């Protein structure tokens, strides 16, 4: 069985085709703003203009008649972007006369991570621009055991990068600068129970930069503080749930320093650490295709008349009836 998935919750526009064995095709055409952060209206216009050619590139590699299921990211995400993707998926499903499956974006990150790494019952640390959560499955639902109280870590990194004059996406640029950092400067460490906050830390880091602290040292201090917070709450969830696997997913999962801190923590606890390949860790169409395929095989289908977008779609809202 073969599924096509369309991802476009924010700046990434991606179409993937998968079967049970692996990724057959994956094409990307992200929206990169000329300056500043992501503008939802401009991002949605980009998606609308580029989707037809992106589909054509996919169908140059895959026979459209071989598609069994059409999946799309139903939420959470930016409303204008989600609507473009949902409209395209509906039209494609109707044209091909194939079933449609709306997929929770966060769930797709976790499931493609499990698929690619072999993790069975992990505590998942989901780190992206729009959100940051500590997730684990309990019964027939994934539950959020801790999350950001304000902005996602990816958004925090981008805000700091923009303030220092760096272009989007800022995360990779902060990572490179941090490698050259030589001095740690204090920043607010905000963990409240299992939740955490980044907005105050961003403001404090921006003030450090404005006061003349080296850009490299600001980046280093920010990463060390933020990633220590994320590692702490992940370790706490691991202990509370008595699990022995950690899965790192989302766009910020590509950060080598975050991987290193989590790996060290897991080694200290005798737990296994997993992270999917970079091309499947961030937002991508293959994760939507795979999760849509998984859902369809277990009885999930989205009627066209109920395929409305859900900008605030929570992972807990999805019933999980597969292993």
From Swiss-Prot:
Binding-site positions, Fe cation = 105, 109, 126, 283
Q: Which GO terms describe its molecular function?
A: iron ion binding; N(6)-L-threonylcarbamoyladenine synthase activity
Instruction: Give the location in the cell.
Output: Cytoplasm
- Textual note on the cofactor: Binds 1 Fe(2+) ion per subunit.
Has keyword Transferase? Answer: yes
A Gene Ontology biological process in which this protein takes part is: tRNA threonylcarbamoyladenosine modification
Name the reaction it catalyses: L-threonylcarbamoyladenylate + adenosine(37) in tRNA = N(6)-L-threonylcarbamoyladenosine(37) in tRNA + AMP + H(+)
* EC number(s) recorded for this UniProt protein: 2.3.1.234
Superkingdom in the source lineage: Archaea
Annotated positions binding substrate: 126-130, 158, 171, 175, 255
Identify the cofactor(s): Fe(2+)
Keyword tRNA processing annotated? yes
The alphabetical list of record keywords is:
Acyltransferase, Cytoplasm, Iron, Metal-binding, Transferase, tRNA processing
Q: Which InterPro entries match?
A: ATPase_NBD, Gcp-like_dom, KAE1/TsaD, Kae1_archaea_euk
- Tell me a GO cellular component: cytoplasm
Functionally, this protein is described as follows: Required for the formation of a threonylcarbamoyl group on adenosine at position 37 (t(6)A37) in tRNAs that read codons beginning with adenine. Is a component of the KEOPS complex that is probably involved in the transfer of the threonylcarbamoyl moiety of threonylcarbamoyl-AMP (TC-AMP) to the N6 group of A37. Kae1 likely plays a direct catalytic role in this reaction, but requires other protein(s) of the complex to fulfill this activity.
Q: How does it assemble?
A: Monomer. Component of the KEOPS complex that consists of Kae1, Bud32, Cgi121 and Pcc1; the whole complex dimerizes.
- Family, per entry: Belongs to the KAE1 / TsaD family.
Name of protein? tRNA N6-adenosine threonylcarbamoyltransferase
Give the species.
Archaeoglobus fulgidus (strain ATCC 49558 / DSM 4304 / JCM 9628 / NBRC 100126 / VC-16)
């Amino acid at each position: 069985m073969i599924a096509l998935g369309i991802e476009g919750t924010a700046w990434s526009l991606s179409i993937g085709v998968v079967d049970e064995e692996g990724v057959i095709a994956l094409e990307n055409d992200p929206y990169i703003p000329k300056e500043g952060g992501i503008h939802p209206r401009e991002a949605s216009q980009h998606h609308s203009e580029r989707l037809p050619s992106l589909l054509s590139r996919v169908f140059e590699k895959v026979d459209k008649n071989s598609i069994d299921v059409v999946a799309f990211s139903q939420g959470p995400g930016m409303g204008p972007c989600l609507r473009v993707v949902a409209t395209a998926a509906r039209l494609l499903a109707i044209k091909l006369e194939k079933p449609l499956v709306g997929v929770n974006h966060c769930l797709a990150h976790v499931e493609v991570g499990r698929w690619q790494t072999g993790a069975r019952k992990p505590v998942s640390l989901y780190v992206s621009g729009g959100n940051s959560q500590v997730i684990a499955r309990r019964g027939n639902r994934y539950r959020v055991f801790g999350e950001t109280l304000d902005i996602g870590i990816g958004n925090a990194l981008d805000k700091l990068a923009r303030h220092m004059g760096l272009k989007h996406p800022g995360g990779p640029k902060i990572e490179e600068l941090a490698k050259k950092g030589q001095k740690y400067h204090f920043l607010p460490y905000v963990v409240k129970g299992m939740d955490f906050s980044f907005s105050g830390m961003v403001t404090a880091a921006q003030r450090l930069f404005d006061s003349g602290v080296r850009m490299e040292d600001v980046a280093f201090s920010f990463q060390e503080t933020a990633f220590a917070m994320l590692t702490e709450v992940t370790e706490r969830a691991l202990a509370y749930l008595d699990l022995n696997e950690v899965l790192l997913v989302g766009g910020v999962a590509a950060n080598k320093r975050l991987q290193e801190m989590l790996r060290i923590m897991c080694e200290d606890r005798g737990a296994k650490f997993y992270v999917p390949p970079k091309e499947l860790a961030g937002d991508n169409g293959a994760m939507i295709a795979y999760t849509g395929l998984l859902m369809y095989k277990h009885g999930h289908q989205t009627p066209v008349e109920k395929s409305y977008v859900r900008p605030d779609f929570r992972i807990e809202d999805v019933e999980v009836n597969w292993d």
